Swiss-Prot record:
It catalyses: apo-[ACP] + CoA = holo-[ACP] + adenosine 3',5'-bisphosphate + H(+). This is Holo-[acyl-carrier-protein] synthase. The keyword Lyase does not apply. One of its GO terms (molecular function) is magnesium ion binding. Its EC number is 2.7.8.7. One of its GO terms (biological process) is fatty acid biosynthetic process. Keywords: Cytoplasm, Fatty acid biosynthesis, Fatty acid metabolism, Lipid biosynthesis, Lipid metabolism, Magnesium, Metal-binding, Transferase. It comes from Clostridium beijerinckii (strain ATCC 51743 / NCIMB 8052) (Clostridium acetobutylicum). Mg(2+) binds at residues 8, 56. Gene3D superfamilies: 4'-phosphopantetheinyl transferase domain.
């Protein structure tokens, strides 16, 4: 049963400006594992923006927005085929009434925008 959905779209140039403007944007927003993935991909703006949009979409699917947790409490990695894999911190699980669920995420981008869609499914 679907218990939450969320979507987010962001301009890739906005994320690129944030990366150029401050060294701390990446460190404040992403986990060490995500940063390692970005490094592997050459810190491309569309990759970073896609992960950022996914975090926003997940916060909306959860139904709280970023209340009680931060960006680094959501980790977006990839499996060997490139499918996004979501890891949530204990802080998020402690906020939720439902404890057993799957989080599905799709990330895409054009030349200008990145978009992510999240579906929270009860098990």
């Amino acid at each position: 049963m679907i218990i939450g959905i969320g979507t987010d779209i962001i301009e890739i140039s906005r994320i690129e400006r944030a990366i150029q403007r401050t060294n701390t944007f990446i460190e404040r927003s992403f986990t060490c594992n995500e940063i390692a993935y970005f490094k592997l991909k050459g810190f491309k703006g569309n990759v970073v923006a896609g992960n950022f949009a996914a975090k926003e979409a997940i916060s909306k699917a959860i139904g709280t927005g970023f209340r009680g947790f931060g960006l680094k409490d959501i980790e977006i990695l990839r499996n060997e085929l490139g499918k996004p894999i979501v890891n949530l911190s204990d802080k998020i699980y402690n906020l939720l009434e439902i404890k057993e669920f799957n989080m599905h995420v799709s990330i895409s981008h054009s030349n200008e925008n990145a978009i992510a869609y999240a579906v929270m499914e009860a098990i």
